[in-house]
From Swiss-Prot:
Sorted UniProt keywords: Membrane, Transmembrane, Transmembrane helix
Recorded superkingdom: Eukaryota
Localization of this protein: Membrane
Membrane topology, from the record: Single-pass membrane protein
Keyword Transmembrane: yes
A Gene Ontology term for the protein's cellular component: cytosol
Record-given protein name: Uncharacterized protein YDL009C
Listed transmembrane segments: 52-72
Amino acid sequence: MKALSVLCFHNPFKRCLGQKSFFVGDSFFIPTPKRLVLGKLRLSNYTAFHDLIIHDLFIYIFILNFFFFPFCNNFNYWKVFHVAQPRIYHHSRLVMILKVSLECAVS
């Protein structure tokens, strides 16, 4: 298994990855993304991120280590092994930033 840390952005009124909250040991399925978009973003104390846009679920996942991602792009099963304290970031509307550490594996 490979470890991958991500930031999951979602509107407070919508569910993120189909769940309102994450706990260590949780598992969930993510469809293979149709498109990988590379870009840079600067948010508060964070530095650059690369974003993965999963259009089917309208979820934005910001990958902390994009060089690691190619080893995971054929995987579709994710398991949560760490959840950081959520942070609130204001950008035109209220968005919750939840940092989640994941493991990827073939389902």
